Structure formats: structure tokens, C-alpha cells
């Protein structure tokens, strides 16, 4: 049986894979596993969602499952995923649930569960919740033992007060275009940036339940790039559907990705003494240019597997203060337990305001190396990388690249392919080396 939980919760097409029945079962299982046993007070869960059309249906189902186990729900409505994580801690709730499929298309939806303190669940806890889903419900409470539902009317204001602390200086000189992806950031992001003093021009901030991520947001930045240039803005910020990501655009319309944002923030935090152990946490997908920029600043880069959960694990293990992904998931543990796109935007603009420098200038140390990616169909994606001929080809490329590039072989998580990625000083070199290794992989399949 396929595992329910993926790298970021449970996802699928709403009302097909992710049905109301499954949502209710997940709510029930989460309540049984995470509701604090023996608590003298009533147990509480925080539930939020993004604006997509299926959110109301799945929210009702999740809450029914939670209430059926005798756990109360604080319903916070449409808010960013990091807001639900923060409020789980702020309200001292037993757990939190966010109903969102992040940057995925509108027909999809997902369920993310946060444990006490707003932390993402570990694999063992997810496995136990999955077991409880398959077991089905046990004996349920009746009468006064059934969970109640309360709308948390102060949820947005509490979250905005919290993220406002990320703006370490006033942003009055700056004009920013904000692409809200018709998602959970549509109210929160413009309000947060205006409260810090920025002149805000929101775009794609009119969610109707159907238009989330539709040609907009952090995965479709063309309209933001055009808007920044046409308005003469200092920068643009793009969020995804649940606002845990932030990518940027400089005044010339050039995209500043998560790697470049991490470089800007790492250098700023090193200067202010906030960068714990002069260490940044990034995934294997970060460009070699990030490593070179950090090396020149004597900043160590700790590398993890793909996924912000692995970044979070390394941050917690080493008590580090900054980590993230090229995709724009940037984690600042002093401000939250997960990536927060609005906090990222505030910190980025604060650096611009403090220094008086443009975003293009601040991001200049990050020089992205040309990257070539080849997908190779294989019979067994788990073993082909260990074939002697493949290992020899990889070793030869690594020797030729030295410290001027890198090669990465990675089995796809969703397809029967191995991804061969090479970064080098020029694209021709990267392509030649990638083809050489891809040919060796293909020959073994």
C-alpha cells in the first residue's frame, strides 16, 4: 500500500485522491495521536486553509474528524501555512492542520499537520497517524465530550504582530510589487509590508477559489517581472499559494531565487552576528554559485536532502539560524518553525533599507553557474548509480570539475528516471559532462 504522507503532508486531487472521507480520517487520527493524553484542560487543534475551492469541504471534514475524537478546534480561516504553524504554538494547541496544496494547481489540495509548538512531524509520527487512518476510529465520546469549534477572530492580527518583528528597520523608502498568487498571502502579505512602511503594489491578490497559482505566484513570475519594471518599483516579491515561499525580482526585472536570497541574508546575518556558527543550511539542489559565494565569505554550508523538512531537521540539530531551498523556502528559526515567505520578504527589504543598496547589488555575490539537467529512463532507479561504469564516469567528471562545479545523480521521487545534473563554469562544459554521465546511466539500464 502506498504511503499517504509525502515530503510535505498528504496531497492529491481534491475529491478524488484526497476525499472528504480521507480528510476526516486524518483529522481523527491526528487527534488520537497528537491530542495530549490525560490533559486536565480540553484538547485543542488549530485548523487553517488556503482559498482554493475545495478547502471549505476538506476543512469541514478534518474538523469533523477532530471533533469526533473530543478535541476542540480553533478555526483560523484563510491564512498562510507558517501562520498556522505559529498559531499552533501561540495558542498552546496540541496540534495544527493546514489545508493547502501550496504551489500546486487549483484542483489539487493537501493536508499538512504540525505537532506541538508548530513543528513539522517526524516520519515515525506520520507513520503512526497513517496506521490509525487504516485502523479506523475506536470508541468515540458523546455529549459534552464531543469537540467544539470556535472561530479564532484574532488569528490574523496575532500573526501580523509576530511577523512584523522581522522588519528590523522601517521600509519607507521602498516600493514593492507583491504577487500573492491569489492565495493565502492575499490579505496578510500586503498588510505586513505596509505596516513596516513599504509602498505596496499588490497583484494577483483577488482569490475566488478557482484562480490560485493560475499563471501567477512563485512558479509563474513573468507578470511580476513586467510589473516591477513598468511601475519603476525597487523590487518584486512572489509568494506561492500558501505563502511559505518567497522569490524576488530586482528593479531590472531579473529573478532573485532562493539561493540568492539566502546569500543576501547570510551575509547580512554574519555582519550583525546573527549567523550562528557562520553556517548556512541548504539542500543538494542549491547551485554551486551559492557554495562559492559562501566560501569566499568564510561561511560553511551544511547540505541536506531535498525538502524543507530536512533543512529544518539540520537547523534544529545544529541550532543554526538560517537555511532554505532554491525554490524560496527560507527558514529563520528565530521567527518560526517552518519557511515563512512574508518573513523572508520583510528581512530582504530590511537589508535593502538598512544599506541603501539595490537588490541587484546585494545579490551580486551569488553568481549562478550554468546548470544542465538530463532525465534518464531506467529499469531500476535505486541501483543504477552504483554500477561500476556509472561510478567511474561520475568520478572522472568530478576530477575534471574540481572545485569549479559539481555533479549530482538523483533518482526521481515520482518517475522511473535518474536525474543527472551538472554545474560548470560554462554551459557547453556542463552539457558535455552531463551527456557523458547520462550515456553511462542509459547503458546500464
UniProtKB/Swiss-Prot annotation:
The active site is at residue 102. One of its GO terms (cellular component) is cytosol. Binds 1 Mg(2+) ion per subunit. One of its GO terms (molecular function) is phosphomannomutase activity. Coiled coil: none annotated. Mg(2+) binds at residues 102, 240, 242, 244. The keyword Magnesium applies. Keywords: Isomerase, Magnesium, Metal-binding, Phosphoprotein. The keyword Magnesium applies. This is Phosphoglucosamine mutase.
Amino acid at each position: 500500500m502506498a504511503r499517504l504522507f509525502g515530503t510535505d503532508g498528504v496531497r492529491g486531487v481534491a475529491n478524488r485522491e484526497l476525499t472528504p472521507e480521507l480528510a476526516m480520517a486524518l483529522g481523527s487520527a491526528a487527534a488520537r495521536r497528537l491530542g495530549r493524553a490525560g490533559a486536565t484542560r480540553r484538547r485543542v487543534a488549530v485548523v487553517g486553509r488556503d482559498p482554493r475551492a475545495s478547502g471549505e469541504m476538506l476543512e469541514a471534514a478534518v474538523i469533523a474528524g477532530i471533533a469526533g475524537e473530543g478535541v476542540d478546534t480553533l478555526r483560523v480561516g484563510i491564512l498562510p501555512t507558517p501562520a498556522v504553524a505559529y498559531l499552533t504554538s501561540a495558542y498552546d494547541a496540541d496540534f495544527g492542520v493546514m489545508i493547502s496544496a501550496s504551489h500546486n494547481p487549483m484542483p489539487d489540495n493537501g493536508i499538512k499537520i504540525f505537532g506541538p509548538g508548530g513543528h513539522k512531524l517526524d516520519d515515525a509520527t506520520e507513520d503512526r497517524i497513517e496506521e490509525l487512518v487504516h485502523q479506523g476510529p475506536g470508541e468515540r465520546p458523546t455529549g459534552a465530550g464531543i469537540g467544539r469549534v470556535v472561530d479564532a477572530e484574532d488569528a490574523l492580527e496575532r500573526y501580523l504582530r509576530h511577523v512584523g518583528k522581522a522588519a528590523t528597520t522601517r521600509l519607507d523608502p521602498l516600493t514593492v510589487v507583491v504577487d500573492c498568487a491569489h492565495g493565502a498571502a492575499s490579505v496578510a502579505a500586503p498588510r505586513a509590508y505596509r505596516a513596516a512602511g513599504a509602498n505596496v503594489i499588490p497583484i494577483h491578490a483577488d482569490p475566488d477559489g478557482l484562480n490560485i497559482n493560475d499563471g501567477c505566484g512563485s512558479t509563474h513570475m513573468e507578470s511580476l517581472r513586467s510589473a516591477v519594471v513598468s511601475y519603476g518599483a525597487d523590487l518584486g516579491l512572489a509568494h506561492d499559494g500558501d505563502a511559505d515561499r518567497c522569490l524576488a525580482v530586482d528593479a531590472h526585472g531579473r529573478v532573485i531565487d532562493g539561493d540568492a536570497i539566502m546569500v543576501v541574508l547570510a551575509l547580512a546575518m554574519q555582519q550583525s552576528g546573527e549567523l550562528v556558527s557562520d553556517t548556512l543550511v541548504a539542500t543538494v539542489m542549491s547551485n554551486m554559485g551559492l557554495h562559492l559565494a559562501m566560501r569566499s565569505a568564510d561561511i560553511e554550508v551544511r547540505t541536506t536532502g531535498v525538502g524543507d523538512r530536512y533543512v529544518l531537521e539540520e537547523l534544529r540539530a545544529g541550532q543554526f539560524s538560517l537555511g532554505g531551498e532554491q525554490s524560496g523556502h527560507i527558514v529563520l528559526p528565530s521567527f518560526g518553525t517552518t519557511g515563512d515567505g512574508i518573513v523572508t520578504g520583510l528581512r530582504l527589504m530590511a537589508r535593502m533599507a538598512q544599506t541603501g543598496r539595490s537588490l541587484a547589488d546585494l545579490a551580486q555575490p551569488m553568481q549562478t553557474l550554468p546548470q544542465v539537467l538530463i532525465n534518464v529512463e531506467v529499469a531500476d532507479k535505486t541501483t543504477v548509480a552504483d554500477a561500476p561504469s556509472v561510478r567511474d564516469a561520475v568520478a572522472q567528471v568530478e576530477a575534471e570539475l574540481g572545485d569549479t562545479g559539481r555533479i549530482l545523480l538523483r533518482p526521481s521521487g515520482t518517475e522511473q528516471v535518474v536525474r543527472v545534473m551538472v554545474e560548470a563554469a560554462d554551459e557547453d562544459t556542463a552539457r558535455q559532462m552531463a551527456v557523458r554521465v547520462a550515456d553511462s546511466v542509459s547503458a546500464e539500464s
